[in-house]
Design a protein with these regions (language model features):
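Cytochrome P450
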Residues: 1-409
Length: 409
């Protein structure tokens, strides 16, 4: 008789799921965190403690992330309503509600109003405008002293300039709205500053919409004013879109561009290969969007009803982080997922999400990266990392890009 005990069957129970610290990229790198592969294999739905003290479910497998980001039982909470704070009820403070948090008919109406300006056709026709913004920044950079800081002088202001031009926000106002956007995004930690900054940004967007009504332009805000005036869109949704652009319309692009350029300059021969073989660029952009691990648990969703996954119960009210960057490195989907393959043929990355809240600016993001790289190849063909100068990183953030990038050319 075999007396060897049978292995215990793992029946996970939410009450005993250990809480781990939020995985962070290794210091001085863009990442991704080393824990991703182990979590995908051993604990695809983990519990993590965020730097703000709250806990959340943390999904790292491609198939799970793909389903969760499109699951109607998960919504985007306002950053001023989540995580819950003692003595603070949802909605009792001026919320920073952006396009990402809108649901139902209001969200659908805003998406319809913006479908044309964010379409492939419109973005393609706008690429000369994007290139002019790149050249406007590169002209003084190329003429300047070496080494130069490519992030501070080009990559950081470039998406802001593009966003301002296309949306209809005066670029010269960036000194006003950028610090307030930082404060509004910090509302989770500093409620008073966040509340004041949010109020100021709302007033700024409202006044800008009024100005577009008096002085129409060739931009998205003017288009939304027209939609409001004919009753197809409510004023608050137009304000929400404006807030989206001020606080999120350029930040992720900046990080992707900085990490992408650093990657091409760090992988031997990659920059020169794309410079000399421009036909590879469309596929290379998709590979960089997959490879660059910016989306490290920055998408926070909240369950509106119970969800069962991997034998565990995500309760209504629980926060869920579908980790897009982890999904994009899933070895069950991508061959050599941790390698950069500029000719990768099959690349179903999830960087832009999917479902009702997939990134409406995905075509614009691709165009920005394409124009950014083309401009660098044309203007700085011998671009290289400066010797004895290392990029500076903000190592406490789950989403990282170099704050500085010293280069020679």
């Amino acid at each position: 008789v075999n007396t060897t005990p049978e292995p215990a069957v793992d029946v996970p129970d939410v009450s005993v799921v250990p809480v781990i610290e939020l995985p962070l990229p290794p210091p001085g790198t863009m990442g991704p965190p080393k824990e991703y592969q182990r979590l995908r294999q051993e604990c695809p739905l983990a519990r993590v403690r965020l730097p703000i003290g709250a806990t959340a479910w943390y999904a790292t497998r491609y198939d799970d992330v793909k389903e969760l980001v499109a699951d109607a039982r998960l919504i985007r909470p306002s950053i001023t309503d989540w995580p819950p704070r003692p003595g603070h009820a949802p909605g009792d403070e001026p919320g920073l509600v952006t396009m990402m948090e809108l649901e139902g008919p209001r969200h659908a109406a805003l998406r319809r109003a913006l479908s044309e300006p964010f379409s492939v056709r419109s973005v393609r026709s706008g690429m000369p405008r994007i290139r002019r913004s790149a050249d406007r920044l590169l002209d003084p950079f190329v003429a300047g002293d070496q080494p130069g800081d490519l992030v501070v002088r080009f990559i950081e202001p470039f998406p802001v300039m593009v966003m301002c031009d296309l949306v209809g926000i005066p670029y010269e106002d960036s000194d006003y709205f950028l610090p307030r956007a930082d404060a509004a995004l910090g509302a989770i930690l500093t409620l008073e500053e966040g509340r004041e900054a949010t109020s100021q940004l709302r007033e700024y967007i409202t006044s800008l919409l009024d100005r577009k009504r008096r002085e129409p332009g060739d931009d998205m805000l003017t288009r939304l004013v027209g939609e409001c005036d004919r009753g197809a869109l409510d004023h608050e949704s137009a304000v929400n879109f404006g807030l989206s652009m001020l606080v999120a319309g350029y930040r992720t692009s900046t990080m992707f561009l900085a990490d992408a350029v650093l990657t091409l300059l760090s992988v031997p021969g990659a920059y020169a290969r794309l410079r000399d073989h421009r036909a590879l660029l469309p596929g290379a952009v998709e590979e960089l969007l997959r490879y660059v691990p910016v989306m490290n648990g920055v998408v926070v969703l909240q369950a509106v009803e119970d969800i069962e996954l991997h034998g565990r119960t995500i309760r209504a009210g629980d926060a869920v982080l579908p980790v897009l960057a982890a999904a994009n490195r899933d070895e069950s989907v991508f061959t050599d997922p941790d390698g950069l393959d500029l000719c990768r043929a099959d690349n179903p990355h999830l960087t832009f999400g999917r479902g009702a809240h997939n990134c409406i600016g995905s075509h614009l993001a691709r165009a920005q990266m394409t124009v950014c790289l083309e401009a660098l190849f044309d203007r700085l063909p011998d671009l290289r990392l400066a010797e004895d100068h290392r990029p500076i990183w903000e190592d406490e953030s789950p989403s990282k890009s170099p704050l500085t990038l010293p280069v020679n050319w």
